[in-house]
């Protein structure tokens, strides 16, 4: 039995239903407009076998579930019309549950369907606590019944709700399963879980790819990665974790990033585990004090707005391209050359970066760098990165 086969056997024995063959994700993702973590959860449920016939049946089952039940935002009204005419309909959507204190009841909000204040049984938030913490994707059986005598109540009712993301986090399950693996085996599992094939990487390259995950795990960790194109610098923050956001290069504002004083609402740093800036060369604040506020936040995890001081835990990541060799760059300028001048030459800003990941040491990705083997379903692995230190 090869090392890969041993790892696969250990994964099946200790994490059944939590793993997926990563090539299946690529196979369906091309034609499915759903988050990777939702897709992989379904694949983990229906395609956890080595039997190609069972896998094919599972793929067809997942495709049918998505085509029949996934709600596209532009088809929300069509779905609601079908629900009204049939009296029942099953949908896949991101559901958030809030406690309405005034009415002393729990209410559900559907992201793509665009409806909210739908009464829901308290058994669901008690059973699946992530519904209360930003919401999770679910498959929901809806019923429609209009009551002439009570025109103010919602005609839409939730008959049944099943999460298609990890509904809660059991750290003890992970700890127990981890004991079956050596350190090197566990590193390979993590890399395959983010879609990479460790057999195509040397030891140094493995650790550099793992380093990209640190801002998702640590609070207030500031990372910079500059390097050639096609090395997947922004992929982790865009596709791998639902708890991070990728801000494309361009103008941003203090209100958007930190705190909106008009609306009295926290910005991105208070809503996400990690805020990543793509193409650092284009970062520009509309506000004159934007960079100073960013430096304060990077140093202490807090910032002042008006009379108040706000704290947040989001890590910051800066990624960008270096279009010339490192040797030339060092002779003519510095390794921070791609940054805007007001950031790249400000030693106070540079001192606040905890780690510079040398992107030129990461190989340009070829098809064989992407794994076809088993790894954790994305939502399972990121559930634990969300338990931040």
Regions inferred by a protein language model and the residue ranges of each:
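Conserved ASCE/P-loop NTPase catalytic core
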Residues: 190, 197-328, 333-337, 351
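Extended, charged/polar low-complexity intrinsically disordered regions
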Residues: 2-193
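Extended alpha-helical interface modules used as scaffolds for assembling large macromolecular complexes
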Residues: 372, 380-384
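Helical mechanochemical/support elements of P-loop NTPase systems and associated helical scaffolds
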Residues: 182, 186, 286, 290, ...
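C-terminal structural cap/anchor segments
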Residues: 356-363, 377-380
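Conserved small/polar residues in nucleotide/adenosyl-binding loops
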Residues: 385-389
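Short acidic, Gly/Pro-enriched loop/turn segments at secondary-structure junctions
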Residues: 362-372
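A short helix-turn-beta junction within AAA+ P-loop NTPase domains corresponding to the substrate/partner-engaging
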Residues: 331-359
């Amino acid at each position: 039995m090869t090392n890969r086969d041993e790892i696969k056997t250990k994964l099946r024995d200790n994490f059944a239903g939590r793993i997926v063959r990563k090539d299946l994700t690529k196979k369906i993702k091309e034609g499915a407009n759903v988050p990777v973590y939702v897709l992989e959860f379904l694949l983990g449920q229906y395609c956890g076998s080595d039997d190609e016939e069972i896998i094919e049946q599972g793929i067809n089952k997942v495709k049918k579930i998505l085509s029949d039940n996934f709600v596209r935002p532009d088809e929300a009204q069509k779905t609601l019309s079908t629900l009204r005419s049939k009296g029942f309909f099953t949908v896949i959507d991101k559901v958030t549950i809030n406690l309405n204190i005034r009415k002393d009841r729990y209410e559900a909000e559907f992201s793509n369907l665009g409806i909210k204040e739908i009464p829901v049984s308290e058994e669901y938030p008690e059973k699946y606590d992530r519904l209360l913490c930003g919401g999770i994707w679910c498959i929901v059986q809806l019923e429609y019944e209009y009551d002439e005598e009570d025109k103010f109540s919602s005609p839409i009712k939730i008959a049944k709700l099943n999460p298609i993301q990890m509904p809660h986090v059991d750290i003890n399950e992970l700890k127990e399963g981890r004991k079956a693996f050596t350190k090197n085996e566990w590193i390979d599992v993590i890399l395959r879980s983010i879609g990479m094939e460790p057999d195509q990487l040397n030891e140094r390259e493995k650790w550099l790819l793992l380093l990209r995950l640190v801002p998702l795990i640590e609070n207030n960790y500031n990372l910079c990665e500059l390097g050639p194109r096609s090395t997947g610098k922004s992929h982790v923050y865009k596709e791998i974790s639902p708890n991070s956001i990728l801000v494309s290069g361009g103008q941003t504002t203090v209100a958007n990033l930190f705190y909106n004083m008009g609306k009295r609402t926290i910005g991105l740093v208070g809503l996400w585990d990690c805020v990543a800036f793509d193409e650092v060369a284009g970062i520009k604040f509309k506000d004159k004090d934007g960079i100073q506020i960013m430096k304060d936040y990077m140093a202490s995890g807090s910032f002042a707005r008006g009379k108040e001081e706000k704290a947040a835990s989001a890590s910051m990541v800066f990624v960008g391209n270096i279009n010339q060799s490192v040797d030339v760059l060092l002779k003519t300028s510095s390794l921070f050359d791609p940054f805007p001048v007001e950031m790249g030459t400000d030693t106070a800003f540079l001192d606040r970066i905890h780690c510079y990941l040398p992107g030129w040491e990461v190989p340009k990705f070829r098809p064989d760098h992407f794994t076809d083997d088993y790894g954790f379903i994305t939502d399972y692995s990121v559930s634990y990165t969300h338990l931040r230190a």
